[in-house]
Structure formats: structure tokens, C-alpha cells
Amino acid sequence: MIFAVDVNGLLKLWLVFSAIYRQTVATIQEEIMVLHSTRWLALAYFTYFFSYGIFLPFWSVWLKGIGLTPQTIGILLGAGLVARFLGSLLIAPRVSDPSRLITALRVLALLTLLFALAFWAGHTVAWLMVVMIGFNLFFSPLVPLTDALANTWQKQITMDYGRVRVWGSIAFVIGSAVTGKLVSLYDHQAILAMLTLGLISMLLGMLLRPSVLPQGQSRQQEAAGWPAWKSLIRQSWRFLACVSLLQGAHAAYYGFSAIYWQEAGYSASTVGYLWSLGVVAEVVVFTLSHKLFRRWSARDLLLLSAVCGVVRWGLMGWTTALPGLVLIQILHCGTFTVCHLAAMRYIAARQGADVIRLQAVYSAVAMGGSIAVMTVFAGFLFQHLHQGVFWVMALVALPAMVLRPRVSAQVNPQA
């Protein structure tokens, strides 16, 4: 009888502790696992661009470190660019329901990590080709889908996009700087290790639950397929042409500025500082975008970006003096950042699934395809015209002044 009483007492004690445990776990999940939506978005940008800050500057160094020739490296990087273009254009638009954006981001982050882990498995050219294509195919849609999530949340909550997106720029600087230091200490092996850690962090961050889930109208069945795309392109072709010219004009800078400046007598460290200056200028404008451009329309921002492009690329072909290069790099906030802010403002004015579709086309065509195509031409022009390639880039940016969309997207006080 005494034993029975003891069992009952223990049972009651167990029930009490179970209730306390469940309540504690629920509290922890509520307080820790749930992240404010703007912080969730900032973390997503940070972890993505931290990883991209490793991949973009240093992946060719890793490929060279495992013994590949420059020609083979070029082929692999070219295949990656094509995969990035296709990933943004074909995968991102498949997410037609804004409420499924977070799930899509988590799946893509997982697939990207799996392909990054596959780089550890082998170094044959055939294997690397498959892995490069798979990695870029799933890595590239993360940006347009994250931007689409930002646009969706701007309709639901008060959010300063520039102050959120700036964490991506900060992360890019940190990722490239830390990896550069580690490469000097541990050679190329540090690159893949850092990339893997960055992608693990990205996946873990995206597994957290945002405080506000995205909501919106999913794509209607009758609007699906080619008619929806045809209508979108017909309505937005001026916008797409404009941003493609402005972003594509960066091709010579991305591909050949380091070579050009080193040939002019600057050390590799100085070239690195100049690149960092451009990103710092980008960070400043993203941070202050709400105050600086709150009343600017997308059309006005595109004009400012085009003017900055003509001035920047013209100066780059004209001088290699250090004061001129400092000004050239500060203008990065005008040629890239202002253009991107204009694009986000224009896209945010769309409705429903058009936000996701146009975001995907912008990322694929302007941020991917145009730069890839212009890089091919820039290589030919740099070989034959040398610094004259930057004058050509200034001419590329010039038509954007007249190609700006006639109907301005609405001014968004939160963008």
C-alpha cells in the first residue's frame, strides 16, 4: 500500500515536471526560435552574401589550387554562369505562392549545401562540371526569392529594405576579407571549408521561424504559362532593358579592373582596398536609402544610376591616378546600389505572383545574363582596346537614360 502511494506520488511529480518541461520548451521556442521578420530577412541576406563573398572572389583560386588549368577553370566558371542564369529564370518563378517562399528558400539552401559538400568528394573535371552546374543552379534562385520575400513583407509590415539589405553587403566584405586572410595562412583548402561553413549557417538561419509569415495571392491558373510571361515582358521591357544595360556595364569592372590597376603599378593589396571601398560606399547608401531616396520614383533612380555609370566608366578609361580611382569606387554606390534600389522599388509595385516572376527575370537577365554576355565582349575589347573597354561600358550605360520605363512605379515610403 505504501508502495502504491509512492508510485502515485512519483506519477504526479512526473506529470508536474512534464508540464513544466513542455511550458519551458514552448517558451524557448517562442523567444529564441522565432525571429522578428526583418531580422530573419537580414540574417538570410547576411549568410547568403557571406558565402557569396567567399565564392565570387576566390573560387577560381580554389580551382587553380586543385591543379586545373586556366582554360578548364574558364569552362567551369562559364558553365556556372549559365546555370545561375537558368536557376534564376526557371526555378524562382515556380514559387508562385508568396506563402511558400520560406519553404522554397529552405529547400534551395539544403540543396546548395549538398552540392557544396560534393566538392569534397572528387576533383575530376567531369565531376566538378556536374557539381558546379548543380551548385549554381540552386544557389542563384536564393537571391530573387529572398528579394521577393522582402517585397511581400513590405506590404505586410513596416520595413526599411535598404537597412535590411545592407547586411548582405557587410557580410560580403567580411566573407572576402576573412577568407583572404585564411588563404594566406592555409592556402586554397580554406576556401571550400569557409564556403561549407557559410552555407551551413545559411541553412540553420533559414530554419528559424519568422514572426510574420508571408501572405499574398497565389498565381491564378488562367494567368499561368506563356501568356503571363508575355504580358509581364510587354509591360516591363523598358525596365528590363534599362537595368540590363546598367548592370551589364559592370562586366569590364568585375572581370578586368584588378588586372588593369595592377598593370598601372598598384599592388594587389591596394586593389583589394579599392574593391572594399566600393562595397563600403554600397553599404552607406543601402543604410541611408530610406532618408535619401524615400520620395524618389524608380524612374528617377534609374536616371541617377545611368548618369553615375557614364561618369564612372568614363573616368575609369581616362585615369588611373589614385584620387580618380577613389572617386570611381565611391561611384559604385550609384552604378550598382541605386540601380538595385530602383529595381526593387519598381518590382515592389507589382501585384501578386508578378512580383516573384519579375524578380526572377530581373535576377536572371540583368544580374546574370547581361553580365555574362558583356563579360565575353569585355574580354575581347580589353585585349584589343585595353582601357578603351571602359569607354565602351560608358556608352553601354548611356541608352538607359532614354529607356527608363515611362510609367514610374509608385513611391514606396518604406523602401
Q: Could you describe each region identified by the protein language model?
A:
Residues 46, 126-142, 244, 324-338:
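Hydrophobic core of transmembrane alpha-helices in multi-pass small-molecule transporters
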Residues 191-207, 389-405:
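Symmetry-related core transmembrane helices of the 12-TM Major Facilitator Superfamily/SLC fold
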Residues 356-382:
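A late C-terminal transmembrane helix in Major Facilitator Superfamily
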Residues 87-100, 183, 285-297, 382:
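Helix-to-loop junctions at the C-terminal end of transmembrane segments
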Residues 140-155, 338-351:
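Intracellular juxtamembrane helix-capping segments at the cytosolic ends
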Residues 34-81, 236-242, 247-272:
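Helix-loop boundary and gating motifs at the non-cytosolic
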Residues 35, 210-243:
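Juxtamembrane intracellular "pre-TM" segments in multi-pass secondary transporters
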Residues 103-116, 300-314:
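Structural signature of the two symmetry-related core transmembrane helices
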